Amino acid sequence: MLTVTCASLSGGQGKTTTALFLGRSLAARGKRVLMIDADPQSSLSFYLGCELSSEQATLLEVLKKEVDVVDSLWNLDDRLALIPADDALDSAQDFLATSGMGAIVLRRRLSPLQDQFDFCVIDAPPQRSQLCMTSVGAADQLLIPAEASSKGLNSLLRTLDLVAEMSEVEAFQGQILGILPFRDRWLGRTQAKQSQKSLESMQEVAAGHPILPSILESEQFKKAIDQGVSLAALGYADLEYPFRTILEKLGC
């Protein structure tokens, strides 16, 4: 199982959008995919239609080792499963902080699933927190979505700093798959000046890491999420190009 974490240290950077469409794209290619909602806001769980019952285990119980990880899986279909989250996940912060190995806890908890799935896609929270660090620490490949704006540039810089710090102490042993510009705005065939300037700045600070094709600003993403369908099903297959590029980089 190859684990891909979507992480960026600010809200509104496209982490959940990226995780959702990447996971579905991998499953559509016939891959067995585990998705993990590591954000207490639990947007990924909501978008995937997960309605938690009192008996359903979540990522919180997995991290605390209160349940076997296989018993936490919410099977969406034959190829797609989810470890969900809810507000209670925030209480895992103290556990991870006092565990002495918070950054590698999730990596260890997932080890029994190595042969059950081809890919794991993790939606990390936007804060520089224990939950974020254990999500990054679990990654073989890291995707950094960043809005094509000054806020997105700052988020990218902060995320790269975190990765560098974790790499120095070997808490992150994976690779950066790429930086994924989000909400790249175009007016017809002309890129908005703010987007153009932001992408140029991202290129300058990327430290040699690849800048992937942008997720364009479009209401069709919200429609696809709300309807639980692909962009291609809505007639906008061209908007899936960034994800096709990611799949190619992952060997799919």
Curated annotation (Swiss-Prot):
Locations listed in the record: Cytoplasm; Cytoplasm, Nucleoid
Pfam (any one): AAA_31
Effect of K151S: Most McdA is diffuse in cytoplasm, a small amount is associated with irregularly spaced Cb aggregates which abut nucleoids, cells elongate. Restores McdA association with carboxysomes (Cb) and their positioning, cells do not elongate
Binding site for ATP 1: G11, G12, G14, K15, T16, T17, Q41, F182, L216, E217, S218
One GO term describing the cellular component: cytoplasm
Site (McdA subfamily signature lysine residue): K151
UniProt KW Metal-binding keyword: yes
Binding positions (ATP 2 in other subunit): E147, K151, R183
Outcome of swapping K15R: Locks Cbs on the nucleoid which are partially aggregated and enriched mid-cell, still nucleoid-bound when mcdB is deleted, might bind better to McdB, cells elongate but grow slower
Domain of life of the source: Bacteria
Protein family: Belongs to the ParA family. McdA subfamily.
GO molecular function terms noted in the UniProt entry: ATP binding; DNA binding; hydrolase activity; metal ion binding
Enzyme Commission number: 3.6.4.-
Induction: Transcription is reproducibly circadian, under control of RpaA.
Effect caused by changing D39A: McdA does not associate with nucleoid, no longer oscillates in the cell, Cbs are mispositioned, cells elongate
Enzyme class: hydrolase
Keyword hit for DNA-binding: yes
Name of the molecule in the record: Maintenance of carboxysome distribution protein A
Subunit structure: Self-associates (probably a homodimer), interacts with McdB probably via the C-terminus of both proteins. Shows no signs of filament formation. Homodimerizes in the presence of ATP, making extra nucleotide contacts than with ADP or AMP-PNP. Each subunit binds 1 ATP molecule; Glu-147, Lys-151 and Arg-183 cross the dimer interface to contact ATP in the other subunit, while Phe-182, Arg-183 and Phe-221 stack with the adenine base in their own subunit.
Domain notes: Has an adenine-nucleotide sandwich dimer structure in common with ParA ATPases. Nucleotide-binding forces changes that create an ATP-binding pocket.
Catalysis: reaction(s): ATP + H2O = ADP + phosphate + H(+)
Entry function: McdA and McdB together mediate carboxysome (Cb) spacing, size, ultrastructure and probably inheritance in the cell. Together they prevent Cb aggregation. McdA is an ATPase that forms dynamic gradients on the nucleoid in response to adapter protein McdB, which associates with carboxysomes. The interplay between McdA gradients on the nucleoid and McdB-bound carboxysomes result in the equal spacing of Cbs along the cell length. Binds nucleoid DNA in an ATP-dependent manner; neither ADP nor ATP-gamma-S support DNA binding.
Example of a GO biological process term: carbon fixation
This protein's UniProt keywords: ATP-binding, Carbon dioxide fixation, Cytoplasm, DNA-binding, Hydrolase, Magnesium, Metal-binding, Nucleotide-binding
Description of the deletion phenotype: Loss of carboxysome (Cb) spatial organization without a change in cell morphology (Cbs are usually regularly spaced along the central axis of the cell); Cb segregation to daughter cells (equal numbers in wild-type cells) becomes random, impairing daughter cell fitness (30 degrees Celsius, 37 umol photon m(-2) sec(-1), 16 hours light, 8 hours dark). McdB still associates with Cbs, which are irregularly spaced, have much larger size variation and cluster (32 degrees Celsis, 80 umol photon m(-2) sec(-1) constant light, 2% CO(2)).
Binding residue positions for Mg(2+): T16
